């Protein structure tokens, strides 16, 4: 039994010294402000890659916005064309409702595909 107490005392003493040595070490990891020249070059290369990536991202964004603006302009032109066609068809419908023959009857029938060109 005495042997066990001696061993447990030795273990507790060694554990205390290990805890004390760990506490003495302080912070782990690299010391701040001590970068080697390769680390500085790596950081510069990383920074340049980041800048290049940002430039490419801005260029892609600019192209995307240009494409969308062209798409909107094309759709607006299509809307204007459809509105003029709608107004023309409404006028033609009103003339037919009044039992009048439309002035450009043949042209309209050709456009609709009812009358074939001669």
Swiss-Prot record:
Family designation: Belongs to the bZIP family. ATF subfamily.
CDD domains given in the database record: bZIP_CREBL2 (cd14709)
One BP annotation, GO: regulation of DNA-templated transcription
Subunit structure, interactors included: Homodimer. Interacts (via C-terminus) with REPTOR (via C-terminus).
Main location: nucleus
Domain bZIP: 40-90
GO cellular component, one term: chromosome
Organism in which the protein naturally occurs: Drosophila melanogaster
Name of the protein in question: REPTOR-binding partner
Segments of this protein annotated with the region Basic motif: 40-77
């Amino acid at each position: 039994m005495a042997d066990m107490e001696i061993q447990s005392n030795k273990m507790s003493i060694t554990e205390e010294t290990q805890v004390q040595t760990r506490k003495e070490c302080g912070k782990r990891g690299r010391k701040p402000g001590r970068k080697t020249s390769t680390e500085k070059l790596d950081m510069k290369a990383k920074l340049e890659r980041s800048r290049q990536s940002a430039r490419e991202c801005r260029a892609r964004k600019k192209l995307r916005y240009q494409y969308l603006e062209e798409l909107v302009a094309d759709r607006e032109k299509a809307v204007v064309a459809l509105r003029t066609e709608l107004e023309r068809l409404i006028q033609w419908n009103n003339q037919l409702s009044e039992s009048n023959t439309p002035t450009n009857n043949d042209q309209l029938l050709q456009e609709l595909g009812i009358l074939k060109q001669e």
